[in-house]
From Swiss-Prot:
Effect of Y192S: In cv. Borszczagowski
Domain of life: Eukaryota
Protein name: Cytochrome c biogenesis protein CcsA
One of the protein's GO biological processes: cytochrome complex assembly
Amino acid sequence: MIFSTFEHILTHISFSVISIVITIQLITLLINETVGLYVSSEKGMIATFFCITGLLVTRWIYLRHLPLSDLYESLLFLSWAFSIIHLFTYFKKYKNHLSVSAITAPSTIFTQGFATSGFLTEMHQSPLLVPALQSHWLMMHVSMMVLGYAALLCGSLFSVALIVITFQKAIRIFCKNNNLLNALFSFNEIQYINEGNYFVRNTSFFSSKNYYKSQLIQQLDHWSYRIISLGFIFLSIGILSGAVWANETWGSYWNWDPKETWAFITWTIFAIYLHTRTNKNFEGVNSAIVASMGFLIIWICYFGVNLLGIGLHSYGSFTLTSN
């Protein structure tokens, strides 16, 4: 009872804090002079990370197994993984962290929000593990898969953002004075040239906009590649450990179960992405298109197959059936 109450409190605290963080970040995206609010939002994300960590540890203690046995617990773990990626980019002092946090922070809150919504209420009290899940491979296989999903989803969203920014016609900036623009574009000042009775704006302003856009695209491409590479490693380890576990449980390394099939498709898509990165002609938008396709494939693999209620890995209608 105590653990259940503590879990309930942590769930609501984490969701409330991260909701405030999202509101603050929307304000900072529109009004860039609110430095204090930006710092507060990062402190809020740190607090959210510890709340979700406490929530997972609490379930681990009173359930006596790693909380990865059903959809609710895996969503909590996915939200926790998103928050790790967010904090990693923050502590790395990434100069365009605000743009990255516009992806990682909402990913955390939407995942956390769905996990704690009424749809999964019956899963909050996890039943005893079925025999197939009572294995030390549960921690290895599922944790690697979910970490892989989190990294690949974030990397794919960076690629989607890259495509949107590349093809948008103009960057609109909301500010109160030119000093903000100067700081944002890393230029000392916007110069004006007086020619007779006319004031001609120096083209450095327009160049600075293009420079900022180019730098942002390069950074998104850089982080997308790094995070997807990390996620691909996690996914590969998860698939291999799952094959070993399946052989111990069912006597076969691979059964072409729907979940296994879509995991293989996901792995193939991102293998193609990483292969395209070896050719400089395919960097940027071309590789980002492949990663964007992977975003949809991941959700089908992770979530869609479970809702169909078929296969060995399915959670059915939010009810655990087997591994």
